């Protein structure tokens, strides 16, 4: 192994990072010519990082099924550079002094490759700056990467906008085994209520 290689240990939700293991019929050809599902996002990131910064990075990737699984992994001694729990779990980890502050570079907008710092919603950044635990802002230890993402993703060649405009699509027999929801317990409860209530 090259001693100059940076090792980045990442743990996030199952199915959140594309591992490039799609079957041929699952790949998506975009108008741009890109093919989604052809490469692993991890391999693409490693290549991009070396091309951009001139240093090799090796991503060691693991997943968890629930926030509590991640918490158990951490309390049993697993160590990661980046974890992606829900807000209540990062708050618990922060309160229990289990997180390391983000680097000074994390919010550096002078780096044109710092896509998070440049592109983060001012609203989300403001919340993370204002909310505190133990007198320290959330933004010292965490960054919001998703906010209000509960919804329906659909293929317009198969489903109309009108059909996808209601949670009732989830219990419409016409779409049996053709639609799914985000693999998240809390979001699933919300979607189930939406599917059951006829006025939503």
Label for each model-derived stretch:
Residues 2-96:
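Early extracytoplasmic/lumenal segment of secretory-pathway proteins
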Residues 71-72, 167-171:
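Short hydrophobic/charged patches on amphipathic alpha-helices used for structural packing
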Residues 158-164, 175, 183-200:
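Extracytoplasmic/periplasmic substrate-binding proteins
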Residues 11-14, 64, 150, 155-156, ...:
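Active-site-proximal beta-strand/loop segments in catalytic clefts of secreted hydrolases
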Residues 20-23, 93-97, 155, 164, ...:
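Short, solvent-exposed loop/turn and secondary-structure capping segments
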Residues 148-151, 190:
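Small-molecule pocket liners
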Residues 56, 65, 91-147, 161-168:
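Hinge/lid segment of periplasmic solute-binding proteins
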